[in-house]
Structure formats: structure tokens, C-alpha cells
């Protein structure tokens, strides 16, 4: 039946959602096991890279090792450059995070807009919501420049990446 044929696709979509939303230690460990063994053949390199990013943020004591392993799995030079750009946002070092954020405020560091938006999104990841609230005002103050120097859709992506994961009163203010 048609429903049966769509089931594997639905399962992968649910797994992709779980990758970005998992919060319990048990589920994070389960995802780590999936990532470590690469046993879900329906997941592609991008899926495993996203999983590595999420795991690096959710298991910071293993983050460096996770990212190093994932980097070795990437063979496409363009995807490797993308990984090197975005993975800088996975550090637990707040000085490096702040420096990375400041670099995104410079137009030349936003040239590849999808990478910049993804990096900004990880800087404002739900696990960092309290810390990252300080990025909101400076990033919004750059919005006119982002609009002037970027693609027509980039300002919306910039604001979405910045605010999507914030729901605190401090962020609202």
C-alpha cells in the first residue's frame, strides 16, 4: 500500500526532527550511538554532520572529538569548507563564541549567507539561550547593513537564525 511505501521516509523525517530536538540524556546517548556507528543508511552526510553539531553542543566534553571524527568523514572539499566555517560555533569557549559572533557582524564574513545563518543559529542554540541573549541587540542593529549587503531573503534568514531559539523574557526585552 501507499502508506507502507511512505513509512521509511516518515521515519527519516522523524529522526531528523529528533536530531535537532533531543534533550534527554538517554535520547542523546542513543543519537550518539547512531552517529558513532553510522548505522542508519538512509541518513546522508549532511544528516550526520548536523547530528555531529548537535552532539558537540549537547555533550560538550566530547565535542572536540565528535567534530574531529566528523571532519574526517567528509570528503567533498566544499562541504569540508562549510564544516570548518560552521563547526567553529560548537566550541564551549565563550571567548571564541563572542569572537565568532563579532566576525559575523562584518559583511565579508557573511559572503556565503547560508553558512553565516547556520553559524548564527548555532550561536543561538537552545542550549545557549541564556548566554546568547547578548547577541540579539547587536545582530538586530546590523540588520540594515545585512539587508543592504545581502541577498533579498538573507535578512529574514538572519533574524530567524538569531531569534528562533529564544523564548525568554530577557530575549523579549
Regions found by a protein language model. Give the residues of each.
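Long, ordered, helix-rich scaffold segments
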Residues: 1-173
Amino acid at each position: 500500500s501507499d502508506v507502507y511505501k511512505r513509512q521509511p521516509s516518515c521515519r527519516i523525517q522523524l529522526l531528523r526532527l529528533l536530531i535537532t530536538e533531543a534533550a534527554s540524556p538517554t535520547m542523546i546517548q542513543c543519537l550518539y550511538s547512531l552517529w558513532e556507528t553510522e548505522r542508519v543508511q538512509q541518513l546522508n552526510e549532511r544528516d550526520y554532520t548536523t547530528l555531529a553539531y548537535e552532539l558537540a553542543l549537547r555533550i560538550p566534553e566530547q565535542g572536540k572529538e565528535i567534530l574531529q571524527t566528523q571532519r574526517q568523514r567528509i570528503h567533498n572539499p566544499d562541504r569540508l569548507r562549510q564544516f570548518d566555517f560552521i563547526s567553529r560555533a560548537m566550541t564551549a569557549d565563550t571567548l571564541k563564541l563572542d569572537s565568532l559572533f563579532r566576525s559575523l557582524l562584518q559583511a565579508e564574513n557573511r559572503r556565503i549567507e547560508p553558512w553565516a545563518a547556520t553559524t548564527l543559529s548555532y550561536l543561538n542554540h537552545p542550549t545557549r539561550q541564556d548566554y546568547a541573549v547578548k547577541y540579539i541587540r547587536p545582530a538586530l542593529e546590523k540588520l540594515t547593513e545585512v539587508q543592504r549587503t545581502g541577498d533579498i531573503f538573507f535578512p529574514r534568514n538572519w533574524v530567524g537564525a538569531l531569534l528562533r531559539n529564544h523564548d525568554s523574557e530577557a530575549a523579549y526585552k
